[in-house]
Design a protein with these regions (language model features):
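Glycine-centered loop/turn motif at secondary-structure junctions
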Residues: 58, 123-125, 244, 283, ...
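Flexible loop/turn segments at secondary-structure boundaries
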Residues: 41-43, 69-75, 135-141, 196, ...
């Protein structure tokens, strides 16, 4: 980090640096960038370049999202059908392309790939956080491994993305036969000692038509779908905890009877900061990643020529610093805020360069929120700072957004 500071000073001041003493320390211990490699397959070279970019901005956590409805891309030994059947999408594949795309595309990550990413990250003082997605966002998993749903379930609950079969059933034995060995194997590949379980966006009314879940509810005293998900996550967290692995999850994991997944879990607050504040007050450590400020799949502006989504608004550069990870009035939970994260989701990505321009220069704003004291850099100052970093992006060959 000291070397990066000197590097950026050289960009600002040239080869002659002013004399002085630098006293600098990060505000938060967790400063992350997430990458969705399930919807769009990013090759290892891209990931290594992203790690280089993160290091230039003193980010220290890479959140690797390689499993979702569309694919499971990690080459695991416990259940090889997961990646063998879903790593590629398109005509003739088990999982078709989105929006009618028929051209075969995709890929998977070998254990050698994982080791390469972990080693490169370690050299840059970055840890890699892996994520599997359960119980929802599991369409690919369900397609690849039969038996993860109750055959007597007559429900057709749909996910936000339109899938009617994307949630595994915690009341059937096959689910546990798959999940516990899978989770332990994945966690064992990454030195961080934490496994992100997903747990977001369970379809409304999930498992409502499942006789097996009805019996589970009666046996365990559960009432709602949130109760069932929470029970499932707590059970999986217990199995991982016994193996020395801490769990993380999206904010929804704390819903349900007895607090869902349990207070030891690290939660990621993505729909806004409110759920994160509530979770922190219940005893969770929280990473703030509100979509309105930190989701880089959202367009930079309303300009119709700007690529990106708009479901949570638009995120111009200035908006990435127009918030505080510890909201005003919630200073009591400051010790529970572990840090911040920017997220890039790949539903609409067709080529890597799109992601580059969505991530940079906005990644600088989230890095700033994670490092600096509250309120130091506003939008105007950030835009000025971004111009300093431009040549550094160019030097590592990272394309950046050049619009307004």
């Amino acid at each position: 980090h000291a070397g990066v500071t000197l590097l950026t000073l050289r960009e600002t001041c040239g080869d002659r640096l002013p004399c002085g003493t630098i006293i600098d320390t990060p505000r938060f211990g967790y400063r992350g960038q997430h990458l969705d490699c399930a919807r769009h397959f990013f090759g290892i070279d891209f990931i290594l370049r992203l790690l280089d970019l993160m290091a230039l901005l003193k980010l220290n956590r890479f959140h690797w999202h390689f499993a979702d409805d569309e694919a499971f891309r990690l080459e695991v030994d416990t259940h090889p059908l997961l990646w063998q059947r879903t790593a590629f999408r398109g005509e003739g594949e088990l999982v078709p392309g989105v929006f009618g795309g028929g051209i075969r595309a995709g890929g998977s990550y070998s254990k050698a790939d994982v080791a390469r990413v972990v080693a490169h990250a370690k050299a840059l003082q970055i840890e890699v956080l892996p994520e599997i997605e359960v119980p929802a966002h599991s369409h690919a998993m369900i397609k690849a491994v039969p038996g993860l749903r109750d055959p007597g379930d007559n429900g057709e609950e749909a996910s936000v993305q339109g899938y009617i079969d994307n949630i595994v059933n915690p009341a059937v034995p096959a689910t546990w036969d798959l999940l516990v060995p899978l989770a332990k194997e994945v966690a064992g590949l990454f030195p961080i000692g934490i496994l992100h379980l997903g747990a977001d966006e369970a379809p409304h009314g999930a498992w409502g038509g499942s006789p097996a879940v009805a019996a589970l509810k009666a046996r365990e005293g559960l009432q709602t779908s949130d109760d069932v998900q929470g029970w499932m996550l707590a059970k999986l967290a217990g199995a991982l905890g016994a193996a020395g692995v801490r769990v993380a999850a999206w904010e929804e994991a704390s819903k349900g009877v007895q607090g869902g997944i349990g207070n030891a879990a690290l939660l990621f607050s993505w729909t806004g900061q409110g759920p994160g504040v509530e979770a922190a007050r219940r005893g969770h450590d929280v990473v703030m990643c509100p979509a309105q400020n930190a989701y880089f799949d959202l367009a930079h502006s309303p300009d119709p020529d700007d690529w990106g989504a708009a479901w949570a608004g638009f995120v111009p550069l200035e908006k990435t610093v127009a918030w505080d990870p510890v909201p005003q009035g919630a200073e009591d939970i400051a010790p529970r805020i572990s840090g911040v994260e920017a997220c890039f989701w790949g539903e609409f990505t067709t080529e890597d360069g799109q992601a580059e321009g969505m991530i940079a220069p906005r990644i600088l704003g989230i890095a700033t929120k994670g490092w600096e004291p509250a309120g130091r850099t506003d939008g105007a100052a950030l835009r000025s700072l971004a111009s300093v970093y431009g040549p550094l992006y160019d030097r590592i060959g990272w394309r950046r957004y050049r619009g307004a």
